[in-house]
Regions:
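Non-catalytic extracellular/periplasmic "stalk"
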Residues: 12-91
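Acidic, glycine-rich catalytic/binding loops that coordinate metals and/or anionic ligands
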Residues: 33-35, 58, 140, 168, ...
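A residue-level detector for short acidic-glycine micro-motifs
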Residues: 49, 72, 108, 162-165, ...
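Short, charged beta-turn/beta-strand-edge "cap" motif at the junction between a beta-strand
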Residues: 53, 76, 112-114, 181-191
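Short, small/polar residue-rich loop motifs at catalytic or cofactor-binding pockets
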Residues: 92-94, 143-144, 168-169
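Short, well-structured beta-strand-loop connectors
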Residues: 98-108, 169-184
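Zn2+-dependent peptidoglycan hydrolase active-site motif and core
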Residues: 105-163
Length: 252
């Protein structure tokens, strides 16, 4: 659970929830050089549940081996008793623009699921555990919520999940360019509070693809620049105009 302070944050997808979600574990694809991508947000965010801290960062299921979550800070402190839930609009992540991490084409676009109340209290925790199990036995979209899948070429596909309802600015078949606004951050699907779930994978179908590695260029809270993936509870500020590395091929 999150303690006070900007760098400390409650997990939006708790370990027990991830266990409930995991059915057939899928091993990652053969190691390939990580693909350099743009960070799909503006401003100051906090990383959590990322592969710099643990692999798999979430689970191998649904190609989440190297997935990462980003949340805007500061956010309301979690409370044990009251209020039992908050409206997603009270969180700074909610409604933030989400951007294309690279040039590509939209292959999946859904935004019809509602943005539910947050699950950051004791009552919310007791509710979200069985809810996560119910979601896990349904379709992947019940876990991902509203989401986009982008074909980045060379066998790499990016997923942006938990989008705000009715916020899509693109449709299936659209070509997008790096940095283009795609949608807004929301709280749909398996999400305790508004945040972005991002992952890279080897195919357009999360049930059969494998997770792939990626790197970002960013500054931490002290202004130091990094090329890689931020560790959990690290401040992430995208560095603009990052040089584009030659794309690595992930095709079998």
């Amino acid at each position: 659970m999150r303690q006070g302070g900007e760098g400390q944050c409650i997990s939006a997808e708790l370990p027990l929830m991830r266990q409930a979600m995991t059915r057939a574990q899928r091993p990652p694809a053969e190691e390939a050089p990580p693909l350099a991508l743009g960070i799909p947000v503006h401003g100051r965010w906090t990383a959590r549940n990322g592969p710099a801290t643990k692999v798999p960062s979430h689970t191998h299921n649904l190609a989440q081996t190297y997935a990462i979550d980003l949340a805007r800070r500061p956010a309301p402190e979690p409370v044990w008793l009251w209020p039992p839930a908050r409206r997603p609009e009270t969180y700074p992540s909610f409604g933030e623009p989400l951007l294309a991490p690279a040039d590509g084409q939209v292959v999946t676009a859904t935004d019809g699921q509602r943005d539910h109340l947050t699950r950051t209290s004791l009552a919310g925790l007791l509710y979200v555990l069985p809810e996560a199990f119910v979601r896990s036995i349904g379709l992947p979209r019940h876990l991902l919520g509203n989401h986009l899948i982008l074909d980045l070429g060379d066998g790499a596909y990016a997923v942006l999940a938990h989008l705000r309802r009715r916020s899509l600015k693109v449709a299936v078949g659209d070509r997008v360019t790096a940095g283009q606004p795609l949608a807004e951050c929301g709280n749909s699907g398996n999400s305790a509070e508004p945040h972005l779930h991002f992952q890279l994978m080897s195919g357009p179908d999360v049930t059969s693809a494998h997770g792939l590695r990626f790197t970002w260029r960013y500054q931490d809270g002290d202004g130091r620049e990094h090329q890689g993936v931020p560790a959990d509870n690290t401040c992430v500020v995208p560095v603009p105009n990052a040089p584009k590395d030659p794309p690595a091929s992930y095709a079998p």
